[in-house]
């Protein structure tokens, strides 16, 4: 897995023209970080395309076969089954998955047939090598009021700005990439939107939650395109994207997350608690296949998935509950449902413990600590929490790129990832084909970051909202979240925060 932020390849060229360093951003070990965030919202998530679904893995020839699989719709392909992965140093305290309708939580699984880039670093969670270049543009937040009781049109100034953007993009589209690379200066890394706010859809969404409410919707615009005002006045009237907290999107505009469940409660489907040793509808796996009675090993594909021992590190012959333990640097384990595949998971490597992942609209809660640790020379002190299209680990997570769907864009979501040794900033990134014509080269990421919890635990919430095509990552540590068996829509709405960092994927 490559740890970097992606945006649409066409916009990469356009945004690279800006050579102005964004205020508030700083470079650390080759990466650019801006503001600490309490919430990051990925919007406009969902794409129609194909990826290569693996159909066979041959241990005699070390080759794999695949066939194109179509996908599409809101959140696609991130609405498919995904597994959750954890790399040390990490102490996982609690983990839970909720669905809008408890009675349908597991049955829905059986129904499924189922950029400029940031600088690449050597510590990949995957072995695939992807060409990458440093992101080098500044963005500003252009804020327009949207009224929930009417589908108002953008202000004239915004409409003009949007028109200027489109004209600028068209004029830049034939630019030489060599000239771009030679003329840029490192600035903010963020996914950006070069379009006007869709006020019709925004108003309809907001009004479904709050009648006659006023909120603000922010459009991220490359600074190289906004040239009408002098630098001083621009900095006063259009704050830089590195000041997301001051360019707020109100909670009412994001509270549509509850639209996935309507007025229903979120019901808990899976739960783990380290202190009590409780585990319900959860299976812990790792990549130690063939070493302790589960999974397989081959010279072609190495160690497959296996049951994880209670220490999270070793293999086991049967399912075990993860202990209340620190998993050291560079060690990984994953979480799945306890529902075994029964000719309903597609192809997977024969001999592995094959389980369903988590799909569709859902709420994921996780409590964890990421203390510093120097026990490994590789991936030292670089913890991460991420999710993968479940087909990837069930075939080949690390190794021959032709033996998983990863490179063709079936989906990876880095939720809380530390990019360099000892760093205390965690960033989120979506990896997929959306916004790219080249396999997994699309997606989006944010250089606004979450603070790494090194001494006390953090509780993170991830909401997958199929109704609004949004994925929300929220730090709910101070929200008195206790991993209850159910949550009401209003409970979840209360977690959403104003001033969230908004990352909108290109269509």
Curated annotation (Swiss-Prot):
GO terms for cellular component: endoplasmic reticulum; extracellular region; fungal-type cell wall. Its EC number is 3.2.1.39. It catalyses: Hydrolysis of (1->3)-beta-D-glucosidic linkages in (1->3)-beta-D-glucans. InterPro entries: YJL171C/Tos1_C, YJL171C/Tos1_N. This is Probable circularly permuted 1,3-beta-glucanase P23A10.11c YJL171C. PANTHER family: PROTEIN TOS1. It comes from the Eukaryota. Keywords: Cell wall biogenesis/degradation, Glycoprotein, Glycosidase, Hydrolase, Secreted, Signal. A motif (ExDxxE motif) lies at residues 412-417. The keyword Zinc-finger does not apply. Glycans are attached at residue 480. It comes from Schizosaccharomyces pombe (strain 972 / ATCC 24843) (Fission yeast). The conserved ExDxxE motif might be important for catalytic activity.
């Amino acid at each position: 897995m490559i740890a970097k932020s992606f945006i649409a390849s066409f916009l990469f060229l356009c945004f690279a023209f800006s050579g102005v360093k964004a205020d508030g951003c700083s470079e650390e070990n080759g990466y650019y970080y801006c503001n600490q965030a309490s919430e990051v919202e990925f919007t406009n998530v969902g794409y129609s395309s194909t990826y290569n679904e693996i159909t066979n893995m041959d241990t005699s020839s070390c080759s794999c076969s695949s066939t194109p699989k179509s996908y599409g719709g809101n959140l696609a392909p991130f609405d498919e089954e995904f597994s959750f992965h954890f790399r040390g140093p990490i102490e996982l305290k609690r983990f839970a998955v909720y669905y809008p309708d408890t009675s349908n939580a597991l049955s829905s699984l059986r129904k499924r047939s189922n950029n400029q880039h940031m600088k690449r670093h050597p510590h990949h969670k995957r072995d695939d090598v992807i060409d990458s270049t440093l992101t080098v543009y500044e963005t500003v937040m252009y804020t327009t009021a949207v009224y929930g009781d009417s589908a108002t049109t953008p202000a004239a100034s915004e409409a003009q700005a949007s028109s200027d953007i489109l004209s600028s993009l068209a004029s830049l589209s034939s630019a030489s990439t060599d000239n771009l690379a030679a003329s840029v200066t490192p600035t903010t890394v963020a996914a950006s939107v070069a379009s006007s706010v869709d006020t019709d859809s925004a108003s309809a969404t907001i009004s479904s939650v709050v009648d006659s409410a006023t909120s603000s919707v922010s459009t991220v615009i490359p600074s190289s395109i906004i040239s009408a005002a002098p630098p001083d006045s621009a900095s006063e009237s259009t704050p830089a994207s590195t000041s997301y907290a001051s360019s707020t999107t109100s909670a009412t505009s994001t509270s549509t997350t509850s639209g996935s469940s309507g007025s229903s409660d979120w019901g808990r489907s899976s739960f783990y608690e380290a202190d009590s040793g409780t585990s319900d509808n959860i299976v812990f796996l790792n990549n130690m296949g063939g070493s302790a009675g589960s999974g397989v090993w081959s010279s072609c594909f190495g160690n497959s998935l296996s049951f994880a021992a209670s220490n999270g590190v070793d293999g086991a012959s049967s399912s075990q509950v993860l202990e209340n333990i620190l998993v050291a640097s560079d060690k990984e384990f994953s979480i799945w449902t306890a529902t075994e595949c029964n000719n309903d998971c597609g192809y997977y490597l024969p001999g592995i413990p094959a389980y369903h992942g988590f799909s569709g609209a859902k709420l994921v809660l996780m409590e964890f600590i990421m203390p510093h640790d120097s026990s490994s020379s590789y991936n030292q002190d670089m913890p991460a929490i991420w999710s993968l299209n479940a087909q990837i680990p069930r075939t080949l997570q690390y190794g021959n790129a032709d033996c998983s769907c990863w490179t063709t864009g079936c989906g990876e979501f880095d939720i809380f990832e530390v990019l360099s040794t000892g760093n205390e900033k965690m960033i989120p990134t979506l990896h997929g084909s959306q916004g790219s014509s080249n396999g997994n080269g699309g997606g989006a990421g944010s250089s606004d970051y979450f603070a790494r919890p090194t001494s006390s635990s953090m509780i993170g919430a991830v909401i997958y909202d199929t109704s609004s095509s949004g994925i929300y990552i929220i730090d709910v540590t101070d929200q008195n979240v206790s991993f209850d068996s159910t949550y009401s829509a209003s409970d979840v709405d209360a977690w959403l925060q104003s001033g969230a960092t908004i990352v909108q994927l290109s269509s």
